[in-house]
């Protein structure tokens, strides 16, 4: 089968008419009709039923449409992978990570990255409680906070980050600032919800720190999103443990009891083995490692 004929067929099937397909392809209606007739003759089946009101795919036509769609998808994927071997970093780059980290730490650094590599276009795919499948091409790169175990993924640790205790200036002005761990008993505590997997072990340590065993504090609010907890703290609702990098997001966020350090999480730069030689991924990895070094220099108490 001739690929040009298949391309014409796929366009006719999508548009629903020979005339419309001709406009898309820059061909006359008669040229499109001849291509389809030749293809039908070669295959020995009718691909379309012609009606006064238009054309409709036959059953063999539906089968061929799906096959051509699969071929086009595979060709596009192969072309994209071949382009990874170019020396110049260019093209689309899809990065997936959590909503909070992507909205705060990562997105704040994308301007510098894109100014350095203007031929790369970035899509940030931010999701919580779900990991996009890199092996199935749902994203090109991931920044994960659990160590990947799949053998076909390349990983590089970026850094470890700790949870610290924060409140807003507004909350402290209205309720005072805890000076000791025991003082936390007199304040509204915001914690992570129990109905979804936590992003880090012992994330609700604030309920138990300084308390007798089996007698945790009662939280004022549970939220099943770190970003939601962050917004609640900023609103002046209460005190919560948050990743330290969020302290860069708002000058109204005040660290409480800085001598207390909560659980930590490791951030990993992850991508499929087949992209090992991708220039786009290489420059992104090196850029983020440089950004991590700068972050560690500024926030020596947090990142390791």
Q: Positions of the model-derived regions?
A:
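A short LG(V/I)-centered, amphipathic sequence patch enriched
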Residues: 40-57
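Short helix-loop hinge/linker segments at domain boundaries
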Residues: 52-55, 62, 73-96
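A bilobed periplasmic-binding-protein/Venus flytrap-type ligand-binding module shared by bacterial periplasmic
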Residues: 267-277
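Central regulatory/effector-binding core of bacterial HTH transcription factors
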Residues: 91-151, 301-304
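C-terminal regulatory
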Residues: 133-136, 148-268, 294-304
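Conserved amphipathic alpha-helical core elements
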Residues: 39-40, 253
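Residues within the DNA-recognition helix of helix-turn-helix
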Residues: 28, 35, 109
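Short helix-boundary/capping micro-motifs
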Residues: 11-26
């Amino acid at each position: 089968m001739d690929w040009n004929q298949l391309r014409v067929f796929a366009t006719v099937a999508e548009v629903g008419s020979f005339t419309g397909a001709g406009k898309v392809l820059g061909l006359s209606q008669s040229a499109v009709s001849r291509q389809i007739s030749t293809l039908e003759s070669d295959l020995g089946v009718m691909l379309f039923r012609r009606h006064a009101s238009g054309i409709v795919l036959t059953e063999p036509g539906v089968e061929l449409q799906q096959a051509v769609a699969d071929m086009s998808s595979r060709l596009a994927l192969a072309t994209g992978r071949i382009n990874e071997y170019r020396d110049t970093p260019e093209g689309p780059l899809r990065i997936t990570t959590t909503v909070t980290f992507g909205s705060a730490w990562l997105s704040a650094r994308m301007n510098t990255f894109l100014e350095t590599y203007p031929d790369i276009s970035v899509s940030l795919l931010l999701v919580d409680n779900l990991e996009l499948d890199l092996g199935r091409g749902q994203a090109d790169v991931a920044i994960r906070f659990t160590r990947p175990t799949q053998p076909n993924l390349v990983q590089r640790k970026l850094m470890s980050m700790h949870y610290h205790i924060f409140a807003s200036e507004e909350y402290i002005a209205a309720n005072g600032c805890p000076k000791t761990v025991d003082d936390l008993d007199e304040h509204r505590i915001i914690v992570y919800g129990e109905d979804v997997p936590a992003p880090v072990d012992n994330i609700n340590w604030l309920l138990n720190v300084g308390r007798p065993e089996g007698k945790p504090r009662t939280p004022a609010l549970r939220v099943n999103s770190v970003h939601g907890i962050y917004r609640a703290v900023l609103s002046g609702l209460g005190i919560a443990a948050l990743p330290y990098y969020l302290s860069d997001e708002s000058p109204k966020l005040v660290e409480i009891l800085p001598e207390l350090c909560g659980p930590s999480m490791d951030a990993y730069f992850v991508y499929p083995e087949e992209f090992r030689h991708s220039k786009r991924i290489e420059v992104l990895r090196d850029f983020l490692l440089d950004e991590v070094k700068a972050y560690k220099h500024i926030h020596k108490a947090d990142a390791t």
